[in-house]
Regions:
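Signature of N6-adenine DNA methyltransferases within the class I
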Residues: 1-234, 239, 280-282, 317-324, ...
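Generic beta-strand/beta-sheet core signal
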Residues: 11-12, 28-29, 303-305, 373-375, ...
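Short, glycine/acidic-rich hinge or "gate" loops at secondary-structure transitions
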Residues: 18, 354-355, 359, 398-405
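Structured core elements
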Residues: 25-27, 253, 272, 301, ...
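Non-catalytic DNA-recognition/assembly elements of restriction-modification systems
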Residues: 90-91, 95, 102, 115-131, ...
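Short coil/turn segments at secondary-structure boundaries
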Residues: 140-145, 266-269, 353-358, 419
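Flexible, glycine/threonine-enriched loop-and-boundary segments that flank and lead into catalytic domains
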Residues: 203-317
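Basic, amphipathic alpha-helical recognition segments used for DNA target recognition
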Residues: 293, 303-371, 376-381, 385-389, ...
Length: 419
């Protein structure tokens, strides 16, 4: 579109009752735009009949990261003036070298030299400062994934399992056993079994009648904390090839977070990391054994579903799945707690929505495009203290709006200079 002479852009938002899409109307002439061409921007999101009218040089859009067309509001133009051309230059130089984990590894030495050259106040793309990406896809979560017995998820499973079993057996009465008929209800039947026996029953029924007989992705296994291995005590071979079943062989599993927790969440999930399972996951054509170089590393993660605000949190030493986007800091000048603060600021959510991706997902390649300001030692100290405070508040269930306001003011004014 921007290769043509753009006359106007009319942002109509979503004028339809049923269709869940935002729309806009544009007018362009099919010829090369003049350097001084001005574009009329009309924002009709609040009032289609009397839209807000603004004017912007077409060259602004051409000189913006991804050549994105944005509303030329006072704030957006201030962001453009400070960072537009800088970030575009960084994107043009580095994107082909950081757009995948393989590219980052291929250009490792050049990236290390670049990181070493950074100084406070410099702008860098997050993808130049971190590694990581998507994680494991098992193709059969019910078989491999369990829920810790002390979590709310475990109680949900205890309630849902009898109904799932009853619904399946109503459809497949030949699967009803004599043992089941001895009990007045499937609730009573399941209560007579140990967790290991319930897991074996559900696994067996799935093997006989199909992977999704209880619903796609349904989790039915519950494990006690004593069944979860101490990650710090695992050998490199156990991390890479699995654990003997004579020992606790479940390990923490970060499966994404539908609730959208910020700062911290102790994952309620665990994956059966036995030697047999790991061997199968590595060879199963339906599974995706990806991101394995980052398994059992602390880092940062978020769910790929973005509900208005980005929600980033500390990732404990675990296996992470395909829905849990994970990054790992590799630059001492820009540590993870600082990145955590920047991503959790309201400004970065606004920046992503305006300049990077305004859909409802926030993928790893969106994160790699974020501009990060290299902090001073004082700024770094402030963010470390604030992140620790926010994490403690999260663990205690006492999140504070004052902490978020303090964070937003600091990131917007002190870090990005948008006073």
């Amino acid at each position: 579109l921007l290769a043509n002479t753009l006359n106007y852009v009319f942002d109509t938002a979503n004028p339809f009752e049923a269709v869940m899409v935002d729309t806009c109307i544009t007018s362009a002439v099919k010829n090369k735009p003049a350097a001084e061409n001005l574009v009329r921007f009309m924002d009709g999101r609040k009032n289609l009949l009397q839209p807000e009218r603004l004017t912007v040089a077409q060259s602004v859009y051409l000189n913006t990261q991804n050549s994105v067309i944005f509303k030329p509001s006072e704030l957006n133009m201030r962001i453009y003036e400070l960072y537009g051309e800088k970030v575009k230059a960084l994107y043009d130089k580095w994107w082909d070298k950081i757009k995948t984990s393989r590219d980052i590894e291929k250009n490792k030495r050049e990236l290390e030299e670049y990181r070493a050259s950074l100084k406070p106040g410099d702008v860098a793309l997050l993808g130049c400062l971190t590694e990581g990406g998507q994680g494991l896809a098992t193709a059969n979560n019910g078989k491999y994934i369990a829920v810790r017995s002390t979590t709310k998820w475990a109680e949900n499973i205890r309630v849902s399992r009898p109904k799932k079993l009853a619904d399946f057996l109503a459809r497949t009465p030949k699967a009803i056993t004599a043992e089941m008929r001895r009990y007045p209800s499937y609730v009573a039947f399941l209560q007579s079994l140990s967790e290991a026996e319930i897991a074996e029953l559900f696994d067996s029924l799935k093997e006989q009648y199909g992977r999704d007989i209880f619903g796609q992705g349904y989790l039915y296994k519950i494990v006690d904390d004593c069944e979860i291995a101490d990650v710090d005590s695992l050998t490199n071979d156990e991390k890479e090839n699995g654990i003997e079943t004579t020992k606790p062989y479940y390990v923490p599993y970060d499966k994404g977070d539908k609730d959208g927790n910020r700062w911290y969440l102790e994952t309620p999930f665990a994956i059966a990391w036995s030697k047999e399972n790991v061997r199968f996951l590595k060879t199963d054509p339906k599974a995706r054994y990806q991101g394995y170089t980052f398994y059992f590393r602390e880092g940062l993660c978020w769910s790929d579903i973005n509900t208005t605000f980005l929600k980033c949190r500390i990732k404990q030493k675990s296996i992470h799945d395909v829905k849990s986007m994970s990054i790992f800091g590799v630059c001492d000048k820009v540590p993870e707690k600082y990145i955590l603060c920047v991503i959790n600021s309201t400004l970065i959510s606004y920046y992503v929505d305006t300049f990077v991706n305004n859909t409802q997902t926030f993928q790893i390649n969106d994160a790699r495009q974020l501009p990060i300001i290299v902090p001073t030692s004082e700024q770094l100290s402030f963010c470390n203290t604030l992140a620790k405070t926010a994490i403690v508040q999260k663990i205690k269930g006492k999140e504070s709006s004052n902490t978020q306001k303090e964070l937003d003011d600091f990131i917007t004014n002190q870090i990005f200079g948008l006073v």
